[in-house]
């Protein structure tokens, strides 16, 4: 042949690192195992804290899985993918980040024997996806519908979700604040539903924008018991003039996003002045322009004027003379919250103000000094769809950790408002899915049975980790729990009623004992649990299908 004797042809750069086939797959599994092991001890009420040093020399002490992984610097691409998975899951449902990483890692660990025995990844993925559908069916049959306005049930749900957090001593305060904040900002969506079940409870769409309308204001000092949710909003601004009123009952509020000062030219402007009269004319025109704007505002008799832009000294003079309190350079986000809480409409031009734009929903405006800062409070609002959460604590580290925990609690309440269904916690759901998949897997034949059963085995990692973090005998506890769920299956099959057996037994994360989760009052949102299982299985399938990793070399100067 003509090509005999030719040297090897180099397609990739000689500096490029490449791993393929089984080597790449096993490397990915080991990387996923390492990431899961980092946060394994942070699951449950008996979780350990992690101390992390950021690149700037700051210290972060937390047991929040997403926060830990965000601070960890990794180099392996699969480890980076797992960390991105945690971040995406946190944005989607706001809770369960630790569980999803541990579960995804266990799915990949259980796939390792199949990879080593040269079973094709597509067959493993097919078995995993089949098991996922079966697991979701089990969760659907097991879900319990809850009334969102039953505050005691919702509180017990949030308690079980944030009981492991650093602020567990003040759980009652945190839960009450989360519940009040979410119910304050939630409102029915005006988007029409086109589903056939439009009248069903699950089809009711709620708009709960806690990121935009539930502002957390952290003020160092005081005690954690001083934390509160305002029935209105507050922001860190002082009035523009010392003679303006600092306390007003039932104020009329006008919101602007236009400057109350002479408008500057948008492009460079040159004016030639030949004598003093021209200069005086220019100054007079500026004063008249500002005066006209102020008179247009004063005509509507507002008590408070808030603008996102500047307020000139002359405008302050007119407002103080008219007994109007003014604020300037307020953030757009804060202005939107004030608008939503007081019923005001943000106006762009003073000559377009209408009576309907004035907000009258606020019951009390007051300036207060906390520490060395002045804060404007808009309280006692009639129907505030926005709120401010005031957090007090001894140090910034404590405040940051409390904020993370409160955010988790609000996400839990938000998820229940969106989908008012619950599943038992404490590893009960995972063990039920595990036993259910084992029973269903025995009916399968062929090579897919192994991967299908591997998903069932992987689901046990949650109750196993809970028992491990409690310091009890893991083998004895998990075996007893598995036996209880298996016995429920046997009873269901013997009775022949065809329904899915509801065994609510799980692990008490504090003592490590087996308890009935329904009596114990530990529940988790249906949407979080289902999304955790979906994300874990789908990410494991994605990583298993990677058979080639090519690492490009960086160019010089970059």
Curated annotation (Swiss-Prot):
Disulfide partners: 381-387
Keywords, alphabetical: ATP-binding, Chaperone, Cytoplasm, Disulfide bond, Nucleotide-binding
GO CC list: chaperonin-containing T-complex
Location of this chain's protein in the cell: Cytoplasm
One example GO MF annotation: ATP binding
The keyword RNA-binding appears for this protein: no
InterPro entries named among the record's database cross-references: Chap_CCT_gamma, Chaperone_TCP-1, Chaperonin_TCP-1_CS, Cpn60/GroEL/TCP-1, GroEL-like_apical_dom_sf, GROEL-like_equatorial_sf, TCP-1-like_intermed_sf, TCP-1_chaperonin
Keyword flag ATP-binding: yes
Main subcellular location of this protein, as a coarse class: cytoplasm
Top-level taxonomic group: Eukaryota
Family label: Belongs to the TCP-1 chaperonin family.
Quaternary structure, from the entry: Heterooligomeric complex of about 850 to 900 kDa that forms two stacked rings, 12 to 16 nm in diameter.
Function: Molecular chaperone; assists the folding of proteins upon ATP hydrolysis. Known to play a role, in vitro, in the folding of actin and tubulin.
Name of the protein: T-complex protein 1 subunit gamma
């Amino acid at each position: 042949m003509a090509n005999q004797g030719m040297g090897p042809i180099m397609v990739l750069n000689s500096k490029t690192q490449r791993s393929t086939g089984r080597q790449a797959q096993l490397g990915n599994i080991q990387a996923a195992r390492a990431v899961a092991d980092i946060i394994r001890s942070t699951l449950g009420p008996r979780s350990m804290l992690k101390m992390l040093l950021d690149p700037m020399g700051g210290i972060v002490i937390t047991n929040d899985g997403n926060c830990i992984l965000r601070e960890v610097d990794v180099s392996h691409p699969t480890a980076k993918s797992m960390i991105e998975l945690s971040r995406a899951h946190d944005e989607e449902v706001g809770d369960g980040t630790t569980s999803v990483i541990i579960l995804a890692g266990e799915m990949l660990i259980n796939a390792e024997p199949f990879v080593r025995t040269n079973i094709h990844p597509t067959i493993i993925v097919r078995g995993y996806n089949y098991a996922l559908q079966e697991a979701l069916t089990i969760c659907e049959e097991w879900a319990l519908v809850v009334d969102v306005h039953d505050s005691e049930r919702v509180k017990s749900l949030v308690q079980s979700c944030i009981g492991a957090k650093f602020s567990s001593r003040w759980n009652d305060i945190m839960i009450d604040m989360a519940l009040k904040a979410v119910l304050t900002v939630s409102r029915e969506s005006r988007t029409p539903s086109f589903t056939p079940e439009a009248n069903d409870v699950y089809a009711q769409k709620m708009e709960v924008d806690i990121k935009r309308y539930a502002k957390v204001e952290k003020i160092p000092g005081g005690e954690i018991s001083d934390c509160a949710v305002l029935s209105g909003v507050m922001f860190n601004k002082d009035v523009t003039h010392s003679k303006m009123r600092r306390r007003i009952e039932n104020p009329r509020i006008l919101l602007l996003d236009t400057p109350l000062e002479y408008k500057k030219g948008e492009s460079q402007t040159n004016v030639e002045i030949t004598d003093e009269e021209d200069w005086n004319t220019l100054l007079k025109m500026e004063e008249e322009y500002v005066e006209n704007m102020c008179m247009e505002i004063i005509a509507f008799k507002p008590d408070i004027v808030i603008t996102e832009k500047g307020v000139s000294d002359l405008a302050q003079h007119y407002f103080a003379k008219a007994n109007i309190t003014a604020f300037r350079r307020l953030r757009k986000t804060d202005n939107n919250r004030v608008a939503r809480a007081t019923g005001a409409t943000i106006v762009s031009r003073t000559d377009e103000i209408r009576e309907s734009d004035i907000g009258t929903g606020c019951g009390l405006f007051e300036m207060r000094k906390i520490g060395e800062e002045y804060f404007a409070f808009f309280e006692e609002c009639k129907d505030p769809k926005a709120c401010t959460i005031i957090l007090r604590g001894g140090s910034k580290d404590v405040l940051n950790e409390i904020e993370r925990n409160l955010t988790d609690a609000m996400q839990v309440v938000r998820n229940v408002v969106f989908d008012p269904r619950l599943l038992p916690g404490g590893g009960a759901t995972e063990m039920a899915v595990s036993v259910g998949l084992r029973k269903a897997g025995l009916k399968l034949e062929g090579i897919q049975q192994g991967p299908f059963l591997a998903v069932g085995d992987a689901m046990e990692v949650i109750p196993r980790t809970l028992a491990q973090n409690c310091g009890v005998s893991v083998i004895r506890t998990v075996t007893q729990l598995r036996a209880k769920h298996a016995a429920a299956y046997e009873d269901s099959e013997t009775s022949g009623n065809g329904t899915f057996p509801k065994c609510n037994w799980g692990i008490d994360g504090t003592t490590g004992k087996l308890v009935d989760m329904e009596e114990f009052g530990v529940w988790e949102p249906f949407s979080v649990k289902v999304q955790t299982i979906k994300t874990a299985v789908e990410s494991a399938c994605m990583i298993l299908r990677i058979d080639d990793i090519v690492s490009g070399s960086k160019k010089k100067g970059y």
